[in-house]
């Protein structure tokens, strides 16, 4: 779990560091999204680092609990992040949980490090393309847009693009294979990825 947290966290912190391999392929200096750190104040940098850490914990450590225990775990995780539990390391006397997460649970939001912004998962939905199926679509291959399909597709795509191994677990018949196939076949750029 620790390795998963660190892999995700590192992938989100790439906004501070341009990828030299991509730059070499392009033949020019690639700018990281936030590569000019001198333009950012220390508080903003800390907010991005903290938020990336919280999001990484949420989607590696916190997702190990099943749906019925997410709310209690959310409350516990908030107390840890806010330094409200004695005996647990405090984060230099500062709260690392952003104000944006005051409504709902930590599972309800996605973090965009390049904008230092938290948004509800549902804001990622393209309302024009919701549940438009091909006439010849096979029932078992249809992906109905839900908050879970949005979350899992985003996380899977992010992990694939950052070469982070993933494992989707859960009860039989909950759509794991369909989510994975949907991302592999319909979301990833065809010029970069081939399905074998």
Short names for language-model regions:
Residues 1-196:
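AAA+ P-loop NTPase catalytic core
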């Amino acid at each position: 779990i620790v390795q998963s947290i660190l892999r995700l966290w590192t992938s989100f912190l790439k906004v501070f560091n341009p990828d030299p391999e991509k730059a070499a392929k392009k033949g020019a200096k690639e700018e990281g999204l936030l590569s000019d750190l001198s333009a950012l104040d220390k508080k903003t940098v800390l907010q991005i680092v903290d938020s990336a850490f919280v999001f990484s914990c949420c989607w590696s450590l916190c997702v190990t609990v099943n749906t019925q225990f997410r709310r209690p775990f959310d409350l516990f995780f908030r107390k840890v992040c806010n330094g409200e539990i004695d005996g647990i390391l405090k984060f230099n006397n500062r709260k690392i949980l952003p104000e944006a997460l005051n409504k709902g649970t930590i599972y309800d939001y996605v973090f965009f490090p390049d904008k230092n912004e938290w948004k509800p998962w549902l804001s990622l939905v393209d309302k024009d393309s919701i549940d438009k199926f091909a006439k010849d679509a096979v029932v078992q291959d249809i992906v109905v847009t839900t908050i879970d399909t949005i979350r899992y597709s985003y996380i899977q795509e992010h992990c694939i693009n950052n070469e982070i191994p993933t494992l989707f677990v859960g009860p039989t018949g909950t759509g794991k294979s369909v989510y994975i196939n949907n991302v592999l076949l319909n979301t990833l750029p065809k010029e970069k990825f081939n399905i074998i």
